[in-house]
Curated annotation (Swiss-Prot):
ATP binds at D9, A10, G11, N12, S13, R14, I15, K16, T129. GO terms for biological process: coenzyme A biosynthetic process. Keywords: ATP-binding, Coenzyme A biosynthesis, Cytoplasm, Kinase, Nucleotide-binding, Potassium, Transferase. It comes from Burkholderia orbicola (strain MC0-3). Pathway: Cofactor biosynthesis; coenzyme A biosynthesis; CoA from (R)-pantothenate: step 1/5. It is found in: Cytoplasm. This is Type III pantothenate kinase. The active site is at D105.
């Protein structure tokens, strides 16, 4: 039996990981928080030694150092590759003027989406600290994207930079809006703030989707991923598909596509 690939998606909010088998199926998955947020280390004691680790890290050098320490503690000398965006990989062509400027998480997500929905035009909306939108043609050409503050960041900015507005988390906002989204306008400040920022997310996505359909003169599947996808989905008025493993699935494809790392660092 071939060794699995360890896949790590280090985002700004949390770190997800998975083991992928020879068929690129995610056979074991988990997540853990950042040290700054009190996140405990993952329990990898039950995992077999992987062939190597393929990492997408958009969370900075401190997180990279923590991941190195975790990997060395569990599997000393384990080969690892920190992925970066390329001009072309796994059937996807990078349309950025400077391809390497595209975030590695977005690149892996594009590769995962192209494989998950072959032959379809896609608009991929991913909800994290930032909300990102990617336009991906059926032939694998990434033609560009948009980046906006995420739902939580929008609400936190209002709470931090105003004197009278509360600072709300997505958990609080989601609870406030439970059963209230049928009403187009809210009648207290916390719900008004929660709904206003949520509708800003939905409005951005629907506008981008309609513009893309008009520009391409073809059907476009809207794909949602990320932590706030359920809440934003309830505010949308257009058809959409949920997929929460695009980045890890893309990393599995990248791991298969690339040769085994030759050294412990890349």
């Amino acid at each position: 039996m071939s060794e699995p690939h360890l896949l790590i998606d280090a985002g700004n909010s949390r770190i997800k990981w998975a083991l992928a088998d020879a068929r690129r199926s995610l056979v074991d998955t988990g997540a853990f928080g950042h040290t700054r947020d009190g996140g405990a280390d993952p329990d990898w004691s039950h995992l077999p030694r992987p062939r190597g680790a393929w990492i997408s890290n958009v969370a900075g050098a401190d997180v990279a150092a923590r991941l190195d320490a975790l990997l060395d503690a569990r599997w000393p000398g384990l080969p690892r590759t920190t992925i970066r965006s390329r001009p072309v990989q796994c059937g996807v062509t990078n349309g950025y003027t400077t391809p390497e400027q595209l975030g590695s998480d977005r690149w892996a997500g594009l590769i995962g989406a192209h494989a998950a929905f072959p032959g379809e035009h896609l608009l991929i909306a991913t909800f994290g600290t930032a909300t990102t939108l990617e336009a991906l043609r059926a032939d694998g050409r990434f033609t560009g994207g948009l980046i906006a503050p995420g739902w939580a960041l929008m609400m936190r900015a209002l709470g931090t930079h105003t004197a009278q507005l509360p600072t709300l988390t997505t958990d609080i906002a989601s609870g406030l809006l439970a059963g209230a989204q049928a009403e187009p306008f809210q009648i207290d400040t916390p719900r008004s703030l929660s709904a206003g920022c949520l509708y800003a997310q939905a409005g951005l996505i629907e506008r981008a989707w309609r513009d893309l359909v008009a520009a391409w003169q073809a059907p476009v599947r809207l794909v949602l991923a990320g932590g706030a996808a359920d809440d934003v989905a309830r505010a949308l008025t257009v058809a959409h598909t949920r997929h929460d493993a695009l980045i890890l699935s893309g990393l599995a494809l990248i791991a298969t596509d690339t040769a085994a790392p030759a050294t412990a660092q890349d």
